[in-house]
Amino acid sequence: MSRRAFARTALSGTAALAVGVALPAPRATASPVPLASLPPLPPLDPGALQAAIDDLEHPPSTAAQLRVGGTAGHWRGTSGVADIRTQRPVTAHEKFRVGSITKIFVATVVLQLVAEGRIALDAPVRRVLPGLLPDRFSAVTVAHLLNHTSGLPDHVGIPEPETAEEVFRHRFDHWTPREWVATATNGPLKFAPGTRQEYRGINYVLAALIIDSVTGRPYGEAVAARLLRPLGLAHTVVPGDDPRIHGRHVHGYLAMADGGLRDITVYDQSSVRGEGDMISTTRDLDRMLTALFSGELLPPGLLRLMFTLPPNDVRMLDGSPARYSTGLQRAVVNGVTLWGKTGEKYGYKNAAFSTRDQRRRFVLAYHPTTARDGAESQMIARISDLLTRDNPGAGGSAV
């Protein structure tokens, strides 16, 4: 794998397109999709779903957990082992690193603060976080961070591991949030804020710092007080400076050049604080989606923002339509619109998506051993296809 590919993984903690290998970019819209326009969903096929997660060769993985919910049916399944040393089978209640699914929690808390009048979406970030961003970034607002239209420049001056061995060697490198922000604020803006969209983890590192500033306590404490405890998410944590996963969990592994696997479960998460550092379970993530989509966490006007893409003239840097809203991403699979998020850390990959009306939700967590070689989204593709394709004989795009 190239130096640049490893660096992208270290920077974002999620897939570059965040959803997968075969997803056609959906048409951007400035308003939510009408629920009546949603196509029919297929009945659940337990055998096919189990076969899809049993295929731990595509991509090479050590384990998988799948939880399907919603009014159209429920199913749970597991495959593989949580620990290759002990060969302990994975269960449906294992903790794992959620990667960029963290952003759903952070965006929700920021919007709660907006609802309380403690911050405004159009507030310049420099005003909320004095002295952190240079003067030339004065046009960047809180809203621009949350929907990835900030235009912040690329990181410079950070380690760029070239091999899996180097990734493993640097797994305990530690950064303060302000040190990490400084690596992405040296150059000029890549585009005028609000005019283009580029998925960047640094946007949510800043969003977490905003939560720190507005609430007067670390963002993890705010997430726990506002979301984790009220919703009973007892197995979801913001780890802070602790590189370990406590309690029953799935180990993550990374394939080395000699073909062996190294346990990369214990890993410093300081560079992804607020954008990819949380730990959870499939049950807890399903509960979070249910509460969010049901309107338990936000007033209607702010909840609509999470299902609203930027205007049609705001496009991704590659010219494709925008696909990120405030805290979520949109994917269209076999004509079915899904909202949610993918996440990725070394040894961990997952997806949490739902139709807007919650007829179908799914949380998938699996454990590829490759360092993002372009094929790691194959399991997400299989599952999303099975859960949305009404005609089993038809082809279709996948998340």
Positions of PLM-derived features:
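C-terminal segment of classical bacterial N-terminal signal peptides
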Residues: 20-27
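Hydrophobic (often cysteine-bearing) scaffold residues that line and stabilize catalytic clefts
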Residues: 45, 49, 98, 102, ...
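N-terminal secretory signal peptides and thylakoid transit peptides that target proteins
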Residues: 1-14
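Short, surface-exposed loop or secondary-structure junction motifs
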Residues: 74-76, 136-338, 342
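Catalytic loop of the DD-peptidase/beta-lactamase superfamily, centered on the K-T-G motif
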Residues: 30-78, 265-399
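Short active-site loop at a secondary-structure junction
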Residues: 60-62, 86-143, 191-200, 273
